[in-house]
Amino acid sequence: MLGLPGEMQYVPGIHSPNEGPRPMTIQRKQTREVRIGKVRIGGANPVVVQSMTNTDTRDVEQTVEQIRQLQEAGCEIVRLAVLNEDAAWAIKPIRSQVSVPLVADIHFDHRLAVSALEAGVDALRINPGNIGTRAAVDRVVDAAKAHNAVIRIGVNSGSLETDLIDQYGGPTPEAMVESAFRHIRMLEDRNFGDIKVSLKSSSVSRCIEAYTLLSAKCDYPLHIGVTEAGTVLRGSIKSAVGLGVLLWQGIGDTLRVSLTSDPVAEMAVAWEILRSLGLRSRGPEIIACPTCGRCEIGLIALAEEVERRLEGETESFKVAVMGCVVNGPGEAREADLGIAGGRDKGIIFRKGEIVRTVKGGSNLLAAFMEELDTFLAHRRAERKDD
């Protein structure tokens, strides 16, 4: 019998409401494994986080500095724009100063791909819509073979081949997939299999459909992303929706969150997407209630200060900052460190045990920060002993 609208229904054989929380599991599609530098992608390897510098690649010092910032923030593969020969050869001194794998982003001129490989890049991204003739692609493939480099076939709906636009009536998901397969066949014809594929669009729904179609038809590793997603707020939302849907289906071996911002800002969003799906974790998870009329402590300031204090932490643990007695004690007990607010007081938990009760709202922030500092000191000491 159907219940009232909005009433939760128990479906036999699905999940009993008395079973408690069931761990979220995602069955990732098994793709071929390739290696970019020292980073293995595809196969049984975890989803890898990528980004792209927005510096002038010819400015070696500035580019190296941004790569280091990206790496510190959690970036595992970095792509560089190669607009001309000077940019291609700038990769050589850049390569000597950074350890993260580098990908050269190539458009229009296949000779730049060859130069970038000779300069030491680990992989290429070529755009089927503008890389040139079959002969040009063949030369790129031969150079990639010689340097043991991966080639990403990077299809973009904004630069799709004109004949496919005409054939499909626009940059449809089907046209994007056909573009990818056209170039996959070119590479396979030269016995080249170190291939990765991406199908990017600024349309979330088009991205999802294109990647879903492609994933069903090939087992090459996929780099997923929503291109030209926008500024931090809108871009983060579009990326979270698009990438989240794909990752939930098990699709995606590397990802990038594309934001109109400092590329370092992409890292936090990318890692939170992975954390939210239980795929990977980096740094602390902060749980905080949205506040309501029951909240009787200065929760917003407390949560913001906790977040600020934990910037730069890379170890994974859970902190709960809760404002009232409804959900607060339960969430705080489950966290490594947590606080549950009450009337002009707060109860601080560590690993489920009450370690401190603080009276007076003005003392709450200072007391919790003391406990947080103690907790972090213990964590660091444990790491040092290991």
Swiss-Prot record:
Cofactor note: Binds 1 [4Fe-4S] cluster.
Reactions catalysed: (2E)-4-hydroxy-3-methylbut-2-enyl diphosphate + oxidized [flavodoxin] + H2O + 2 H(+) = 2-C-methyl-D-erythritol 2,4-cyclic diphosphate + reduced [flavodoxin]
Cofactor(s) of this protein: [4Fe-4S] cluster
Record EC number: 1.17.7.3
GO BP of this protein: isopentenyl diphosphate biosynthetic process, methylerythritol 4-phosphate pathway; terpenoid biosynthetic process
Enzyme superclass (EC): oxidoreductase
Family: Belongs to the IspG family.
Gene3D superfamilies tied to this protein: Dihydropteroate synthase-like (3.20.20.20), Sulfite Reductase Hemoprotein, domain 1 (3.30.413.10)
Gene this chain is encoded by: ispG
Signal sequence, renumbered to the chain: none
Molecular function via GO: 4 iron, 4 sulfur cluster binding; 4-hydroxy-3-methylbut-2-en-1-yl diphosphate synthase activity (ferredoxin); 4-hydroxy-3-methylbut-2-enyl-diphosphate synthase activity (flavodoxin); iron ion binding
Pfam families, per database record: GcpE
Role of this protein: Converts 2C-methyl-D-erythritol 2,4-cyclodiphosphate (ME-2,4cPP) into 1-hydroxy-2-methyl-2-(E)-butenyl 4-diphosphate.
Residues noted as binding [4Fe-4S] cluster in the record, renumbered to the chain: 289, 292, 324, 331
Pathway info: Isoprenoid biosynthesis; isopentenyl diphosphate biosynthesis via DXP pathway; isopentenyl diphosphate from 1-deoxy-D-xylulose 5-phosphate: step 5/6
Record organism: Nitratidesulfovibrio vulgaris (strain ATCC 29579 / DSM 644 / CCUG 34227 / NCIMB 8303 / VKM B-1760 / Hildenborough)
InterPro entries cross-referenced by the UniProt entry: Dihydropteroate_synth-like_sf, IspG_bac, IspG_bac-typ, NO2/SO3_Rdtase_4Fe4S_sf
Swiss-Prot/TrEMBL keywords: 4Fe-4S, Iron, Iron-sulfur, Isoprene biosynthesis, Metal-binding, Oxidoreductase
Protein name: 4-hydroxy-3-methylbut-2-en-1-yl diphosphate synthase (flavodoxin)
